[in-house]
Amino acid sequence: MAAEAAGGKYRSTVSKSKDPSGLLISVIRTLSTSDDVEDRENEKGRLEEAYEKCDRDLDELIVQHYTELTTAIRTYQSITERITNSRNKIKQVKENLLSCKMLLHCKRDELRKLWIEGIEHKHVLNLLDEIENIKQVPQKLEQCMASKHYLSATDMLVSAVESLEGPLLQVEGLSDLRLELHSKKMNLHLVLIEELHRHLYIKSTSRVVQRNKEKGKMSSHGKDASPGPLIDVSNISTPRKFLDATQYSAAGSSSVREMNLQDIKEDLDCDPEENSTLFMGILIQGLARLKKIPETVKAIKERLEQELKQIVKRSTTQVADSAYQRGESLTVDNQPRLLLELLELLFDKFNAVASAHSIVLGYLQDSVGTQPTQQEEIKLYDMADVWVKIQDVLQMLLTEYLDMKNTRTASEPSAQLSYASTGREFAAFFAKKKPQRPKNSLFKFESSSHAISMSAYLREQRRELYSRSGELQGGPDDNLIEGGGTKFVCKPGARNITVIFHPLLRFIQEIEHALGLGPAKQCLLREFLTIYIKNIFLNQVLTEINKEIEGVTKTSDPLKILANADTMKVLGVQRPLLQSTIIVEKTVQDLMNLMHDLSAYSDQFLNMVCVKLQEYKDTCSTAYRGIVQSEEKLVISASWAKDDDISRLLKSLPNWTNMAQPKQLRPKREEEEDFIRAAFGKESEVLIGNLGDKLIPPQDILRDVSDLKALANMHESLEWLAGRTKSAFSSLSASQMLSPAQESHVNMDLPPVSEQIMQTLSELAKSFQDMADRCLLVLHLEVRVHCFHYLIPLAKEGNYAIVANVESMDYDPLVVKLNKDISAMEEAMSASLQQHKFQYIFEGLGHLISCILINGAQYFRRISESGIKKMCRNIFVLQQNLTNITMSREADLDFARQYYEMLYNTADELLNLVVDQGVKYTELEYIHALTLLHRSQTGVGDQTTQNTRLQRLKEIICEQAAIKQATKDKKITTV
């Protein structure tokens, strides 16, 4: 067991360590480092036991595998014998070869002679075959050219010319053929260059044309449901992807350009033009073999701009043809949408052309790379040259369509800002445009046999003409708009930029991406667009809106020009608006639309909005001052409206807040009439206290009703303008706060509006509302100032100590004038103001008149019974007039009438009346009544008696107040 353990130990050690010498060194080190003799003896014993065990295992293995071991030994012996035999045979072969060499050396001269003769005969046969083949070259060349297998034709022609000018140069019979083939070789590259240009500019765009035709068919199928443009602009925010070779190559050929030029092979069994990318590679390969690459590059450079112009011309005709087939007339309808359709088509085509050029340029670089000796001599163009020419052509196109040369007559109005002076056209400008419904014809001849055959014939003729020249003949050409020798799909004008700006900007971004321009550098087309908008378009827009606004604001009296009924109906307003306000609002709306159409210049348009609104605000302020200012002094109503305390008080009263809130939405108040009556009393108290007992001269009131009507129109107009501008600005600010996901669906690249501009716009809208409120306050106060103007002199200067006669039966002339003024103002206000504002002006007027008349009692020198009757008749006629205006009984004037009827009593009777009926008036009003009675009646005692009565009046009023308070406290306790 110990031996097996020792053997297992050493076997495991050997299996772990593949190096036996290392194991031996380890054992020796163990024996040498051990100081104990017994340990060394034990180690030695283990080694011996392991050795004996290994020897026994080896014997067992030999016994077990004896057959295999014997077979291996025999196989080894057989292999050794074969190797020995092979060595002997090789030695014999070497000896035989040496013998053959010696024999051949003896016959070398005869063999050399036979070999040379064989070569000569073979060469003669080759020349004869070559001559025979060359004679067939013209016929084969013609066949290859007809089938457009240009690479085979080029190889055949180059090879034939090289043979004719080389080995066969001395053959006289081939001189005519030599001249013919040489001439064809000199002209073949022109054919190849022409084919290359056809594929660069026509074939490359054919797929774009086909795609638009398919889209047109889809649009025509859905035309009955909702007619729309041929080019779908609903997804206009999606950037256009660059076209690659797969868009005009055959299916499955997307990796064609990944092949080198040398790897391109021509398949004689296929249509060579089926794969345009491969075909252009074949053309370049043929030109390279003709050594005409420099001429090819030169031709491409020289013809690039002209070919791009031809694409524009063909695309214009194509768009016109699409419109013609849809039944649209370009000469009747000015449709910038067709310009957008044209540009979208051109962008697709130019991208296709650029992709084709990139492929051709790659092939040219491959062809130059195979000729290192000429690499420095041949200077290729690059894609930057292509994009520069594309930008130049687009720039020329935009110059024409944007009318940068100002070919339109100066008298021709702008499409967007031409506000018609006639009412019907002016109203039509604001009317909602109804979608045009296609007119359904009653019957057609298109399904008749004659129509079908004629349509097929015409369609085939048009397709053939278009495939050859790329232009449509007849029909749509007559549909194009002529202009200075150029044909347009829509009328040239600066406003066309609004339709095409965003698509054009996206294409510019694609160009800059293709050119690898960083943010700091712009392409030429962007610079052109920026210069045009900043230096031309913005100034033109400003000139147009200035002309339109000045046309209605620079008149002698801009506040008298109102919009007509048609415009009011379209705008949905109930009262007339100033035409100047509508023009300004439409200008703001137009500028806001321009801000969205040309979002990159939103700040400029918003600044214009601020400037125009500020100018109109100044215009309105000037017109307002022209009405309310007389000899450098404001009329009283305007000065009161300007007073912060008075205006703040008036706006805090419930009748002002009720005016801004519909009646059904107002909060219900208990004893609302008493609440409003208290408000009227407060207003009357402030106005009477503010004026005092001064007489108002005629120049301090607005006597001309047309001025009041102008103020009313200004109020309605400015309030409408403030509401429209607030709505526009709030939608603008809301669009700036959208989430990015929402913003992508609402707006494209609309930069955030600065807080300063938004604040300015908000302040302007608020200033218009404030000005409108001030106009309404002036009207509200002016009616009341008229009452002061007529009623204060009635008491101060009127004679009411009259006897009963005919004169006493007449109304006071001042009351008649006041009634006349109130009626005139009512007529003007009812036509100019909305009903709730009209009510605001005249509600509470009876209370004020009542207060003025009651307060005027102190100014009468004396009053008789006839004077009291006349005064009551004055009050009655005023009450009757106000009732007709407000359509409610003016109970406050009953209060004034009862006050004067109270003067029928003597002073003592008046005191008893107060005791019996309670206190209806203020202590001061009772004092004025007692004082007037004391002045008017005889035998009422001296001043001492009068003072006693006044003292008694105070006591009565105090007693009545105490009784009233006690009753009130009792009610509270009961509750």
Swiss-Prot record:
A Pfam family that the UniProt record links to this protein: Sec8_C
Superkingdom field: Eukaryota
Record has DNA-binding as a keyword: no
Post-translational modification N-acetylalanine, affected residues: A2
UniProt KW keywords: Acetylation, Cell projection, Coiled coil, Cytoplasm, Cytoskeleton, Exocytosis, Phosphoprotein, Protein transport, Transport
A GO MF label: protein-containing complex binding
Cited InterPro entries: Sec8/EXOC4, Sec8_exocyst_N, Sec8_M
Modified residues (N6-acetyllysine): K9
Main location: other
Modified residues (Phosphothreonine): T238
One GO cellular component term noted in the UniProt record for this chain: neuronal cell body
Any one GO BP annotation for this protein: Golgi to transport vesicle transport
Family to which this protein belongs: Belongs to the SEC8 family.
Function field: Component of the exocyst complex involved in the docking of exocytic vesicles with fusion sites on the plasma membrane.
Designated name of the protein: Exocyst complex component 4
